[in-house]
């Protein structure tokens, strides 16, 4: 993937959960930030990943690092918030311009089916189910997501991750390493999967 230019993407507008419009760059102006771009708020894998990333929140806060979740639409936001899946601030990219500028692809109706049935997504859904995390199929099923970690003031991109499959996510140790912090968290147990079944 080409190098991300923060200046143009930084001027994209997001909507806070309270309805206020903010520029993306305002999120890294005063502190480093971990930006988690969800596929959608009802996505079971996204909910599990949000809960997993939230394990880092105390360590991020202790180091003055913001944790932010961004969704491509408002659909499912209320249920996502009520479920307590994510400990950071939440925003909506209503125009999906950040998603486009950061290279988070859109599936087609034909390409989403094999992606959704792949081994990676089965592994994560097994983890989610084991933790009682459910999902739904409301909203835009074709949008992918990823992560962007930016240094304070937008000095540089510390990590840019684009989902190749809906089950892809950044391991907690990679997030900590990108930020050069140590975190006292235990990642969720990884299930063992073959082509037919996943077990814990």
From Swiss-Prot:
<keyword id="KW-0444">Lipid biosynthesis</keyword>
<comment type="similarity">
    <text>Belongs to the peroxiredoxin-like PRXL2 family. Prostamide/prostaglandin F synthase subfamily.</text>
</comment>
<keyword id="KW-0963">Cytoplasm</keyword>
<keyword id="KW-0276">Fatty acid metabolism</keyword>
<keyword id="KW-0643">Prostaglandin biosynthesis</keyword>
<keyword id="KW-0644">Prostaglandin metabolism</keyword>
<keyword id="KW-0521">NADP</keyword>
<keyword id="KW-0560">Oxidoreductase</keyword>
<dbReference type="GO" id="GO:0001516">
    <property type="term" value="P:prostaglandin biosynthetic process"/>
</dbReference>
<dbReference type="InterPro" id="IPR036249">
    <property type="entry name" value="Thioredoxin-like_sf"/>
</dbReference>
<dbReference type="InterPro" id="IPR013766">
    <property type="entry name" value="Thioredoxin_domain"/>
</dbReference>
<comment type="function">
    <text>Catalyzes the reduction of prostaglandin-ethanolamide H(2) (prostamide H(2)) to prostamide F(2alpha) with NADPH as proton donor. Also able to reduce prostaglandin H(2) to prostaglandin F(2alpha).</text>
</comment>
<protein>
    <recommendedName>
        <fullName>Prostamide/prostaglandin F synthase</fullName>
        <ecNumber>1.11.1.20</ecNumber>
    </recommendedName>
</protein>
<dbReference type="GO" id="GO:0005829">
    <property type="term" value="C:cytosol"/>
</dbReference>
<dbReference type="Pfam" id="PF13911">
    <property type="entry name" value="AhpC-TSA_2"/>
</dbReference>
<dbReference type="GO" id="GO:0016616">
    <property type="term" value="F:oxidoreductase activity, acting on the CH-OH group of donors, NAD or NADP as acceptor"/>
</dbReference>
<dbReference type="InterPro" id="IPR032801">
    <property type="entry name" value="PXL2A/B/C"/>
</dbReference>
<keyword id="KW-0275">Fatty acid biosynthesis</keyword>
<keyword id="KW-0443">Lipid metabolism</keyword>
<dbReference type="GO" id="GO:0047017">
    <property type="term" value="F:prostaglandin F synthase activity"/>
</dbReference>
